[in-house]
């Protein structure tokens, strides 16, 4: 397994653990998690999270409407073309998966920071949407793996598109929400 993929999985695991810990803390104490990240750090973290979210939203919709459609085209040409495309796609994944993992980590980490430009309730919503996107990821990965191992099938393609649509919608809503909250509040 390539190092970038181990990094990707590890980052998603940390994001999920941070989210679960925040949910558990809030459920038990009926208070938000303690703010370990000061306001100045949170301003930078939220800005980075917002930028990463919008980058990933663009990538998600490009993949949904363009890149994944190429699987259908390549399968029509033949198995050799399809597998060559799949291998090339997999080799180029770091540019997609590492910023995605960083965005999810930024927003789940923001649950543990002081409230700044984006209110705590919005941070919870954005982090939850990031977690929903993480939970949809295995189905897309399994569909891609199935197509790489056994070639293109309509069922695997539908699974890929459906799970990717869930991820794309969740991240788009999160990005719009973060942007609206960032603009809504007066600048300090």
Give the predicted meaning of each segment.
Residues 37-54, 106-131:
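Interfacial segments of alpha-helical transmembrane regions
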Residues 96-111, 167-176:
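Core segments of transmembrane alpha-helices
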Residues 63-70, 101-117, 138-143:
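Membrane-helix exit/interface motif
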Residues 10-25, 57, 101-112, 126-134:
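Hydrophobic core of alpha-helical transmembrane segments in multi-pass integral membrane proteins
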Residues 2-6, 10, 17-99, 148-158:
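Interfacial loop at the N-terminal end of multi-pass membrane proteins
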Residues 125-148:
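Hydrophobic alpha-helical transmembrane segments of integral membrane proteins
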Residues 184-188:
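Juxtamembrane boundary at the C-terminal end of a transmembrane helix
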């Amino acid at each position: 397994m390539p190092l970038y993929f181990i990094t990707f999985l590890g980052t998603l695991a940390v994001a999920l653990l941070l989210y679960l810990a925040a949910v558990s803390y809030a459920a038990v104490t009926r208070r938000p998690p303690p703010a370990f990240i000061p306001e100045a750090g949170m301003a930078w973290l939220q800005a980075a999270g917002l930028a990463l979210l919008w980058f990933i939203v663009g990538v998600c919709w490009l993949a949904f409407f363009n890149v994944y459609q190429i699987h259908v085209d390549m399968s029509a040409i033949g198995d050799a073309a399809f597998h060559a495309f799949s291998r090339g796609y997999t080799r180029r994944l770091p540019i997609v998966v590492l910023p995605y993992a960083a965005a999810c980590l930024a927003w789940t980490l923001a649950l543990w920071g002081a409230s700044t430009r984006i209110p705590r309730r919005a941070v919870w919503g954005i982090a939850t949407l990031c977690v929903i996107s993480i939970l949809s990821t295995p189905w897309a990965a399994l569909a891609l793996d199935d197509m790489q191992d056994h070639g293109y099938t309509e069922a695997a393609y539908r699974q890929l598109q459906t799970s990717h649509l869930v991820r794309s919608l969740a991240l788009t809503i999160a990005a719009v929400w973060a942007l609206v909250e960032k603009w809504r509040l007066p600048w300090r």
